[in-house]
Amino acid sequence: MESLQNHFLIAMPSLHDTFFERSVIYICEHDAKGAMGLVINKPLGIEVNSLLEQMDLPAEQVSTDLAFNANVMMGGPVSQDRGFVLHTSQPYWANSTDLGCGLMLTTSRDVLTAIGSNRSPEKFLVALGYAGWSKDQLEQELADNSWLTIPATNALLFDIKHEDRWPQASRALGFDAWQVSAQAGHA
């Protein structure tokens, strides 16, 4: 299967998993060993500025950017105590991975300090936890019609409100996801 890195997984309406129902997941990595992604539309109930305050991070300049007050996302059920910042490409921080397509994933505290200062990435999304799949697990879920895929866009990642991301992603498919059957191969 071709890599789905830099794609979105869109939960099928028939997926009734309590965590992944109506989820949109940005796939950060996908190779023969498995896949890793971040749920981008499930808020944790805490804003980024509150998270910075809880971590006692100094803020040289409080950003007026909408993202500064954006919700921290529940990135997935794995390692929910671990933070991830998905952001537009900027100078590297301590633990940054270039994902291509002008995006980076950073897991170090220094990017959070930068978010509270004038060195913030232009656009960013903060998440706690991630979604992970072992070898061939995601491929099986795709074969089971749990997910639809589309290429990722920065607009959906950063410019659309979290509650509008699943409907927007579904519309980007070019059809109404609610009218797609979860059953494959039956007429």
Curated annotation (Swiss-Prot):
It comes from the Bacteria. GO terms for cellular component: cytosol. Belongs to the UPF0301 (AlgH) family. This is UPF0301 protein Sbal195_3177. It comes from Shewanella baltica (strain OS195).
